[in-house]
Amino acid sequence: MADLKTNLLGFTMNSPIIGASGTVGYGVEYEELADFSRIGGISGKGLTLHGQYGNKGERLWETPSGLINSIGLQNPGVQHFIDVELGEMLELKQKYGTVAIANLGGHSEEEYVEGAAMLSESGVDIVELNISCPNVKVGGMAYGVKAEAAGEVVRMVRDACKKHLMVKLSPQAENIPEMCRAVEAAGADAISLTNTFQACAIDLEKRRPVFDNIFAGLSGPAVRPIALRMVWQAVGAVSIPVVGLGGIATGKDALEFIMAGATAVQVGAANFANPRAMETIAEEMAAWMDAHGVKTLDEIRGCAR
């Protein structure tokens, strides 16, 4: 029987499958739908220092091979998360061993630092620093394009945060390997990539862009080969763990990222199509491994390089 256990930053996870931020709430919403013993961790809904309502107008738009979203980081704020939602995540961890990851966005360096400092004193296992959100007008992806800007904000957060720090990168980065090296040098413990790809949709009946911000984030199967290429580049550029995400919907998809060198993977849009997607992906990975005589993921991690 294949063993999917995965070590990420010292945490032994049930599997390499992590629920991507913004697609599984804080985990508890999925508890009755999925077998959490198959899930390695949950990255909670993206947080900002102060709660915000998110974007107005249309927020989701399906494409033939994916989903475009413009949520705009709607969230209750860091303090509310610490007081309420984090407790639910930690209960899941106690029951199933799922690693609790807090995804932190921001509109300025100061907001990132203050939010990270608050999370540093909480019970979260990992802080996922989101410098790559394409759906907010200020901050967010502004730090995810240029390596110098990314390195600076990561360095400031590193000084304020005692937790393991995973930096979530944008596919819009000018140079993926350079960006990865910059955040590693600034103190990142791990990298997750890639966030959604900036996209656009037109409503033919209204004869105008679907989203008020015009551009929004594309995820789903359409982006997977590009995300895989970026993960390949990242693994070759740094010595810290790389968590791959982008269009993973099957066990074979996840195994491609593992063979490219990813330590773990995140599953996002697939959760909207199938609430049991993470569990199913883990089962499919194990079935493939059993069929090919592979006992652990370490035997094939990075084997394609």
Specify the residue positions occupied by each region the protein language model found.
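A short, charged, Gly/Pro-tolerant segment at domain boundaries
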Residues: 298-305
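C-terminal helical cap(s) of enzyme catalytic domains, especially alpha/beta-barrels
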Residues: 54-64, 202-216, 258, 270-295
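Surface-exposed amphipathic alpha-helices with a cationic face
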Residues: 7, 11, 82-95, 120, ...
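Small/polar glycine-rich anion-binding or flexible loop at a beta-alpha turn
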Residues: 248-252, 274, 305
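N-terminal capping/small domains of soluble enzymes
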Residues: 1-100, 106
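Alpha/beta enzyme core
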Residues: 32, 107-243, 249-267
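Short gly/pro/ser/thr-enriched loop/turn and capping motifs at secondary-structure boundaries
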Residues: 48-53, 133-136, 198-201, 272-274
